[in-house]
Amino acid sequence: MHHEPATWRRVLDLLAPCEPVVVYLFGSRAHGRSRQDSDMDLAVLPGRSLQPMAWFDLQGRLGEELGVDVDLVNLAEASAVLRKEILAGGKVVWARDLQQRAEWEMYALSDYARLNEERAPVLAALGQPLAGHAR
């Protein structure tokens, strides 16, 4: 599947119920390492919350429309670690407002930094380094 403008217009049309603030492509498709059977990993920061079943339905509709399995992540509900991984390795495919995007990314990264500070004593007691830090 190609990531052409028409593809992203279809994605955005389908995501309209959650009023996306920013949409990221992550995983193998974000880095040109996908195979024919690779799924599409999308992360969305919604401007409007949806019930979990609505997210599930949205994921299914995206998969049907795009002809690939879609893994749809709601960034408002994702863990600090997953959000950081998406920011570190994902690509922004659409943003409604650059200021909102920048503010959210700063929040997500500071939340991850706070998590690392909070878990550092526990990991040190267990003799494990923080992810991304050498011993």
Label each residue range with its predicted role.
Residues A43-L45:
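Short hydrophobic/aromatic beta-strand micro-patches
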Residues M1-Y24, H31-R35, G47-R135:
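Catalytic core of pol beta-like nucleotidyltransferases
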